[in-house]
Amino acid sequence: DINGGGATLPQKLYLTPDVLTAGFAPYIGVGSGKGKIAFLENKYNQFGTDTTKNVHWAGSDSKLTATELATYAADKEPGWGKLIQVPSVATSVAIPFRKAGANAVDLSVKELCGVFSGRIADWSGITGAGRSGPIQVVYRAESSGTTELFTRFLNAKCTTEPGTFAVTTTFANSYSLGLTPLAGAVAATGSDGVMAALNDTTVAEGRITYISPDFAAPTLAGLDDATKVARVGKGVVNGVAVEGKSPAAANVSAAISVVPLPAAADRGNPDVWVPVFGATTGGGVVAYPDSGYPILGFTNLIFSQCYANATQTGQVRDFFTKHYGTSANNDAAIEANAFVPLPSNWKAAVRASFLTASNALSIGNTNVCNGKGRPQ
């Protein structure tokens, strides 16, 4: 089997029948942090208790750091070959909540910052929400790529809060004033755990969280129900009040379509393949959009260029061929899970780099992978 796991954000997608091609074991969602460790150190026990299997790929919403890339290049690349890190799909980060009321909850960016810093501790602090009572934040307990995507946004946009947000995979470590301002904040593990805590009927209503869109609502239409999933981005433009947007895929696709490709000369560097949104631009950092839903990013795939087993090499190539294909691909499943497929120019760049046999980056290139390969 081709064994892999990691981020829970795309877990439902990768468990959708026929998304993973023949030879792939079922995806195991444990969080991006454990997924990266599992791949980088070939530690299958990050997925559970089994220590006898090898790890062949990972899913992560958290981009590999410079240190992670350098360590792998020094310790593993000489025997196993280069790693490949590419975006899989684009995603919003949704803000679902449990607080009954007839009004739509539409957060300005400043209000969103206030809720997650603890500055706004009562629902009455959100204008137009028509609700009152304590706000209780639910956050991911473990190292989470969804948390990284969310804290990137908070870091870029929440510049007038009493404290500052750092970009991190661990929410409890993000805000400079700690969790103390978030009275009664609740830690939960995994996307399933977060939604279970959010919807816990044994406690008073009032909880709010951040999560991927496939978990935020039971249906695609549910993402547009602002009595359960907040709109984000209300404000005043040229003296006219404007509503925020829902986290539905249609509201992030325009921003994704204009993200620039990595330069052809740089495509051997795994770092350049994953654009991130941030406060500053350049060096792979893209400005947050001025329109549409504002909290967005990518979930990524981490594979090896070389596998010791020829059958596994072919199976990985088959998956790339389908996932990044022009037709008979995974786009319908991606959209059904509330994500956005990569634009056609991005798919073409992935195919040209990692599937074209003559390209030195191609998966299983016999000249490059001669004597190298990730263990079977």
Curated annotation (Swiss-Prot):
GO terms for biological process: phosphate ion transport. Gene3D superfamilies: Periplasmic binding protein-like II. InterPro entries: PBP_domain, Phosphate-bind_PstS. The keyword RNA-binding does not apply. Keywords: Disulfide bond, Phosphate transport, Secreted, Transport. Disulfide bonds join C113-C158, C306-C369. Found in human plasma. One of its GO terms (cellular component) is extracellular region. Phosphate-binding protein. Belongs to the PstS family. Heterooligomer with human PON1. This is Phosphate-binding protein. The lineage of its organism: Bacteria, environmental samples.
